[in-house]
Amino acid sequence: MQHDHSAEPLSPGLYIVATPIGNLGDITLRAIETLRRCDAVACEDTRMTGKLLKHLGISKSLWRYDDHSDAKAREKIVAAISEKAVALVSDAGTPLISDPGYRLVRDARDASLPVTTIPGACAAIAGLTLSGLPSDRFLFAGFLPVKDKARREMLEKLAPVDASLIFYETGPRLLKSLAAIDEMLPNREISVARELTKLHEECRRGMGAGLMAHYQANPPKGEIVLMVGPPPEAAPDDTDAELMLREALETMKPSQAAGHVAKATGLDRKDLYSRALELKT
């Protein structure tokens, strides 16, 4: 007869457990089993994790932990890991990915304690798979800085990276970030994914001007994954420029569209304006 291990406690160690990013149905069977069998849960917000555990019918000791916790707090958890199975979770998604945890994992490994991962949902990866942007190479850069100057400086440093770029963003800051990307990383496709795995999930892809116009008319809500395609391999040809011009004309006057495409491509603004007038007639 096969022995049922589900009721047995886990071996001592740190268990990095991914949790849903919006849809509770996305939690894995292994994550549920780990949370059920562990001795305690280190979490970013005890209220958020408490709700998840209640939904799963699990009662556990919750220890608040984030990367602002001092060294003494980490020392206590590391000491406990030598004798107990401790699950590490964030409010949503995979711990350590723009969420607390790396200092705790580092300290546990430095102490030669067992560390394992129970993988699952990650908003950055979910957004990339929906975006339609190249996914063979990508760089996740967390949240863009709040201040405009720092935001532009960060984008300038990332401009040469030959990969799709992934950021997290909030609804109120999206337009400012789109404007900065349009300025610092011109002629690149941008994708905005929001409310991932939820009822009103949305993913839009386009150039900066078109996306800014859309979100000015439809202020976004919820958490956002903001993605930027890699640098173009070569200067756009006339066909590419016309496609950009057609898209820009959906939200701009001919003169504005010509200026936008000229800035992005380096093509002559007068020629683009003449073509824009032809396309409008």
Swiss-Prot record:
CDD domains: RsmI. It catalyses: cytidine(1402) in 16S rRNA + S-adenosyl-L-methionine = 2'-O-methylcytidine(1402) in 16S rRNA + S-adenosyl-L-homocysteine + H(+). It comes from the Bacteria. It is found in: Cytoplasm. PROSITE patterns: RSMI (PS01296). One of its GO terms (cellular component) is cytoplasm. It is an enzyme of class 2 (transferase). Catalyzes the 2'-O-methylation of the ribose of cytidine 1402 (C1402) in 16S rRNA. Keywords: Cytoplasm, Methyltransferase, rRNA processing, S-adenosyl-L-methionine, Transferase. Its EC number is 2.1.1.198. This is Ribosomal RNA small subunit methyltransferase I. It comes from Erythrobacter litoralis (strain HTCC2594). One of its GO terms (molecular function) is rRNA (cytosine-2'-O-)-methyltransferase activity.
